[in-house]
């Protein structure tokens, strides 16, 4: 398995092969999981959840200065290079309305919808751009894990966490009066049902030669709770609901964004965006190794209003 391809964003820190000696120096525990792949290069068993957790811990220490990171068993353990790409592509989106300059610092505020136990997007966004984050989730266990990560790294001023109390809503009832965000991020549940998630997991296990029939929900890149992997109606329903709810926050968010894994969902999403009255829509392809994805972004502000948003933020800095 080759973890990185040249399709990564130019600012992504994970170009080329992983530097295992540096990673092991940063986190010596990685040494016991390091193997030699069929090409004679150091690697890990990417089907081993514990190995991937330790590997991520080493990456975050060595590349981002995150000293403490862990997640509960059976929660999603994210592939960091792909997650970083989303942050960088979103940063470029903000730069487009800001004379080509990526806005940095605490004046930029992002909302991560479904922050998860791993808290990965706020960690990467803060490390690379010093943005402030609000992370939301419906799962109190995930939020407790994310809170432990934030506190252990002294990031309480940069990253705030909040539970979405109504599982039927995404944005509605979450934001407080007067809150404004430059950006929302979302990596929506991919599958439409538990059975579909299970089948997808088993296919990936089979491809890795590690299928485990004893699990009710096999590890899928590399773990994942039900609400992380599937929701009723799948990705298309989640994103179209997000679009519908975003209308009520049209003046309080500069850019709404979401990842979309299935290209076949794009026509339905584009139709929902047209119906919503969004004044700007972007679909940006993202290639990460063997996986192809894309970021869908929309704004209810026209070009002049978006540029004025950046100017106002600068005046308040």
UniProtKB/Swiss-Prot annotation:
<dbReference type="GO" id="GO:0070475">
    <property type="term" value="P:rRNA base methylation"/>
</dbReference>
<dbReference type="Pfam" id="PF05971">
    <property type="entry name" value="Methyltransf_10"/>
</dbReference>
<dbReference type="InterPro" id="IPR016909">
    <property type="entry name" value="rRNA_lsu_MeTfrase_F"/>
</dbReference>
<keyword id="KW-0963">Cytoplasm</keyword>
<dbReference type="InterPro" id="IPR010286">
    <property type="entry name" value="METTL16/RlmF"/>
</dbReference>
<keyword id="KW-0489">Methyltransferase</keyword>
<comment type="similarity">
    <text>Belongs to the methyltransferase superfamily. METTL16/RlmF family.</text>
</comment>
<dbReference type="GO" id="GO:0005737">
    <property type="term" value="C:cytoplasm"/>
</dbReference>
<dbReference type="GO" id="GO:0052907">
    <property type="term" value="F:23S rRNA (adenine(1618)-N(6))-methyltransferase activity"/>
</dbReference>
<dbReference type="InterPro" id="IPR029063">
    <property type="entry name" value="SAM-dependent_MTases_sf"/>
</dbReference>
<protein>
    <recommendedName>
        <fullName>Ribosomal RNA large subunit methyltransferase F</fullName>
        <ecNumber>2.1.1.181</ecNumber>
    </recommendedName>
</protein>
<keyword id="KW-0698">rRNA processing</keyword>
<comment type="function">
    <text>Specifically methylates the adenine in position 1618 of 23S rRNA.</text>
</comment>
<keyword id="KW-0949">S-adenosyl-L-methionine</keyword>
<keyword id="KW-0808">Transferase</keyword>
């Amino acid at each position: 398995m080759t973890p990185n391809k040249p399709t990564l964003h130019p600012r992504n820190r994970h170009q080329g092969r992983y530097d295992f000696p540096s990673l092991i120096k940063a986190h010596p525990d990685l040494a016991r999981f390091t193997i030699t792949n069929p090409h004679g290069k150091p690697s890990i068993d990417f089907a081993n959840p514990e190995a991937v957790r330790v590997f991520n811990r080493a990456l975050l220490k060595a590349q981002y200065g995150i000293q403490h990171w862990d997640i509960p068993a059976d929660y999603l353990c994210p592939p960091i290079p792909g997650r970083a790409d989303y942050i960088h592509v979103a940063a470029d989106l903000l730069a487009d309305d800001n004379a080509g300059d990526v806005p940095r610092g605490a004046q930029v505020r992002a909302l991560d919808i479904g922050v998860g136990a791993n808290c990965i997007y706020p960690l990467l966004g803060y490390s690379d751009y010093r943005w402030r984050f609000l992370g939301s989730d419906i799962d109190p266990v995930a939020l407790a894990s994310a809170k432990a990560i934030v506190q252990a790294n002294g990031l309480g001023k940069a990253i705030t966490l909040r539970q979405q109390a109504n599982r039927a809503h995404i944005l509605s009832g979450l934001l407080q009066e007067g809150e404004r965000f430059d950006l929302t991020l979302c990596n929506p549940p991919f599958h439409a049902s538990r059975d579909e998630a299970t089948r997808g997991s088993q296919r990936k296990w089979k491809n890795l030669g590690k299928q485990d029939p004893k699990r009710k929900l096999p590890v899928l890149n590399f773990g994942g709770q039900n609400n992380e992997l599937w929701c009723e109606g799948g990705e298309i329903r989640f994103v179209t609901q997000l679009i519908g709810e975003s209308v009520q926050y049209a003046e309080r968010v500069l850019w709404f964004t979401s990842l979309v894994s299935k290209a076949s969902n794009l026509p339905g999403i584009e139709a929902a965006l047209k119906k919503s009255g969004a004044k700007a829509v972007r679909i940006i392809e993202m290639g990460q190794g063997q996986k192809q994805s894309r970021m869908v972004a929309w704004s209810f502000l026209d070009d002049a209003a978006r540029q004025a948003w950046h100017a106002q933020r600068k005046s308040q800095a």
